[in-house]
Amino acid sequence: MRARGVTSRMLSRLKRLVSRPVGCAAVAMALLASGCGGGGPLESEQVFSDNVFSGNHLKPKDYPIHGIDVSKFQGDIDWNAVANSGVKFARIKATEGGDQDARFQANWEGAKAAGIPHGAYHFVYWCRPPLEEIQIFEQNAPVEDDALPPVLDAEATPTSPTCRHHVTQDEAIADTQVMLQEMERHYRKRPIIYTTVDFYEANLSNGALTDYPIWVRSTKHHPAVKYGSRAWHFWQYQSDGRVPGIGGSVDKDAFYGTKEQWDAFLREPGVRPVETGAGGPAPAPTASQTAAAQPQESIAEPAGAPAE
């Protein structure tokens, strides 16, 4: 990656940030994302397209730690190429209802061999007893001390060919709680809830399950626009990303904080500290963090894909 200095364009952007009520930390994050300090470790120039993200909030590129989430639909993945591209973590689909993802074992072993921090997720099937679902997940996703916390993918499934059951808010919260508690008991780590805008608004916006970190989907707006003041750990900002080593599209995600906070999360994953706010600017990075971190590529949401 070529070294970059502070251009007039960067200075103009920083002046605009300073004039907005986002605080000094946002300016620091903007400097971080601009690559001040001589560039970062990525082998190729990474380009973001922010035209789909509106408002004065931070853009995906303003966060230094980026990752992907994958399933069988990504096919055969060259995990060494993924690692060399700068991807910092991978979420790997293990199960959906009572079925194992066909590529889970290969993806798990590949990410591990490539040195990419990785964790498994379960996609909820609302027509099966919740405890039974998680027991199937536990039979497939191994317990490993260095794995990322497990994720429960809780979203509405109105188009499912086999499960059209519309869960009530009480059912959704109760079943989700059962699954999260069993995950935590088995893996000895606080699990993470993945949620979409519609599921969150219908079931979690009233303050339910705030003891658990959340991973939010929002491909058009910053999470603060759609999820309010709820602090988030991970933001799925794109569903048609491109990453070396993966032949087609892939979901791309950002971690909420600095490299230092990411390293702390890897050591002790858990509920995000309240003082960091709702997905807003993280504390200002150090000079070494600024020099070391560069984000991933981003392109616009594809035509016909749901934008939230």
What residue ranges belong to the model's regions?
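Hydrophobic anchor at the start of a short beta-strand
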Residues: 118, 189-191, 214
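Aromatic-lined carbohydrate-recognition surfaces of secreted/lumenal glycan-active proteins
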Residues: 188-201
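Substrate-binding cleft of extracellular glycoside hydrolase catalytic domains
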Residues: 60-76, 92-180, 184-186
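Functionally critical loop-and-helix segments that line ligand-binding/catalytic clefts
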Residues: 40-70, 209-308
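Bacterial N-terminal signal peptides that target proteins for export
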Residues: 4-23
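Conserved beta-strand positions
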Residues: 70, 92, 152-154, 193-196, ...
